């Protein structure tokens, strides 16, 4: 795997982590305010789920060395 491919995978991983963590946190806020009387655990749960999903996606991306954004990279 070349350095540029590795950099692209790290960039995609970090962007995915920010999006999923923010979405989980946002959903935690919504559920905390509407259903759970302003408790803190929905925020932690939503953030944890988002972080776990992002970690799983990153792990999958790094374990598949010949896939990059859904395209096969040919060996040279």
From Swiss-Prot:
Can you state the subunit structure given in the record? Answer: Component of the mitochondrial contact site and cristae organizing system (MICOS) complex, composed of at least MICOS10/MIC10, CHCHD3/MIC19, CHCHD6/MIC25, APOOL/MIC27, IMMT/MIC60, APOO/MIC23/MIC26 and MICOS13/MIC13. This complex was also known under the names MINOS or MitOS complex. The MICOS complex associates with mitochondrial outer membrane proteins SAMM50, MTX1 and MTX2 (together described as components of the mitochondrial outer membrane sorting assembly machinery (SAM) complex) and DNAJC11, mitochondrial inner membrane protein TMEM11 and with HSPA9.
Secretion signal span: none
Q: How does it sit in the membrane?
A: Single-pass membrane protein
Could you tell me which Pfam families the record lists for this protein?
DUF543 (PF04418)
Mention one GO biological process in which this protein takes part, according to its record: cristae formation
Which ranges does the record mark as transmembrane?
17-36
Q: Spell out the family assignment given in the record's similarity comment.
A: Belongs to the MICOS complex subunit Mic10 family.
On this chain, the residues bearing N-acetylserine are 2
What keywords are assigned to this protein? Acetylation, Membrane, Mitochondrion, Mitochondrion inner membrane, Transmembrane, Transmembrane helix
**Protein name as annotated:** MICOS complex subunit Mic10
Q: Tell me which domain of life the UniProt entry assigns to the organism this sequence originates from.
A: Eukaryota
User: What's an example GO cellular component term for this entry?
Assistant: MICOS complex
Q: Which residues lie on this side of the membrane: Mitochondrial intermembrane?
A: 37-76
Q: What role does this protein play?
A: Component of the MICOS complex, a large protein complex of the mitochondrial inner membrane that plays crucial roles in the maintenance of crista junctions, inner membrane architecture, and formation of contact sites to the outer membrane.
Q: Would I find Transmembrane among this entry's keywords?
A: yes
Organism source for this protein?
A: Mus musculus
Q: Does the keyword Acetylation apply?
A: yes
């Amino acid at each position: 795997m070349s350095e540029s491919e590795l950099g692209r995978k790290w960039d995609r991983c970090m962007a995915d982590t920010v999006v999923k963590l923010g979405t989980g946190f946002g959903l935690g806020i919504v559920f905390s305010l509407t259903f759970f009387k302003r408790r803190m655990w929905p925020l932690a749960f939503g953030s944890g789920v988002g972080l776990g999903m992002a970690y799983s996606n990153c792990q999958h991306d790094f374990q598949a060395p010949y896939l990059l954004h859904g395209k096969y990279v040919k060996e040279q």
